[in-house]
């Protein structure tokens, strides 16, 4: 699926506009059969040599956005995700006293525009729009300030979840980790104040989730600080920060969109496996 600039971006909220002049938008894309990183600038991508986390240099090549295929924007070694991080998603449960994290395998990653595949025996697969933190440096036992500095940028994510398996299985390995259950992208945005951005999830054009990231129970640095007590975080690692409100089941033929101000729109069709 080719994605245009108009499809990618919505303007950031007023509170985030102050950071706009220093924003950098990184993408990962296919040129022919080769994957590369680049900086998105209007309708063009300036190709980089190396990853955004290791002092990349421009190659001099420039590509039209419409001529390339966007991939999930980095290659993490690990993916963590937050449970119960908006009060609107708690139901009758009490707010957690500490960040509640779980794993999603890297094999669950899916590109912008590519399909979410529902396994044949899955009957209650929900979409969960989320802000995703991108780690930019190796960090262990971080202070709050070190945790803040370790967050390279942010992107959009969809924590696809099979609710029946969540309830029935001891572990969430398939409920949260089936192939294609972690669409991410389309860009990593650096320099944006992500503490007060409107997040919206749409299913077939209908808004089913809408809430500000200001309502997170645990903010980005708090999540990174807690996670780094137990797990060494490395450049490119991803942390989904939790989903707001209620969610809805998807079916083959649906299209789901996760939109966050300043970060663009992550759009994926849904197909049967």
Explain the meaning of each model-derived region.
Residues 2-12, 17-99, 122, 171, ...:
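N-terminal non-catalytic cap/leader segment that marks the start of a structured domain
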Residues 2-4, 89, 163-273:
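Catalytic-pocket segment enriched in acidic/His residues
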Residues 69-71, 90-92, 116-125, 139-146, ...:
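A generic local secondary-structure boundary/capping motif
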Residues 93-99, 144-155:
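Short Gly/aromatic-enriched secondary-structure transition segments
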Residues 95-112, 127, 257-261:
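Structural signature of FAD isoalloxazine-binding scaffolds in flavoprotein oxidoreductases
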Residues 129-131:
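Ligand-binding beta-strand-loop-alpha-helix segment within the catalytic cores
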Residues 134-136:
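Short, conserved beta-strand element in jelly-roll/cupin
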């Amino acid at each position: 699926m080719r994605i245009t600039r108009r499809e990618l971006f919505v303007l950031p909220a007023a509170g985030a506009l102050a950071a706009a002049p220093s924003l950098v938008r990184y993408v990962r894309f296919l040129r022919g059969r080769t994957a590369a990183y680049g900086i998105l600038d209007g309708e063009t991508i300036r190709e980089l040599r190396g990853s955004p986390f290791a002092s990349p240099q421009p190659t001099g090549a420039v590509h039209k956005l419409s001529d390339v295929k966007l991939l999930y924007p980095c290659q993490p070694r690990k993916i963590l995700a937050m449970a119960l991080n908006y009060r609107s998603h708690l139901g009758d449960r009490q707010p957690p006293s500490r960040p509640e994290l779980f794993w999603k395998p890297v094999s669950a990653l899916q590109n912008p525009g590519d399909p979410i595949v529902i396994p044949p025996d899955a009957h209650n697969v929900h979409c969960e729009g989320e802000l995703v933190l991108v780690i930019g440096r190796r960090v262990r036992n971080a202070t709050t300030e070190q945790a803040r500095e370790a967050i390279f940028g942010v992107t959009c994510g969809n924590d696809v979840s099979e609710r029946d398996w969540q309830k029935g299985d001891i572990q969430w390995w398939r409920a949260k980790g089936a192939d294609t259950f972690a669409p991410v992208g389309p860009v990593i945005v650096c320099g944006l104040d992500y503490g007060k951005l409107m997040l919206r999830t749409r299913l077939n054009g209908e808004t089913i989730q809408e809430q500000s990231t200001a309502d997170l129970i645990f903010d980005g640095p708090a999540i990174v600080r807690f996670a780094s007590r137990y797990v060494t975080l490395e450049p490119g690692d991803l942390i989904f920060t939790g989903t707001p409100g209620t969610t809805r089941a998807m079916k083959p033929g649906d299209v789901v969109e996760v939109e966050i101000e300043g970060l663009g729109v992550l759009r994926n069709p849904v197909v049967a496996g």
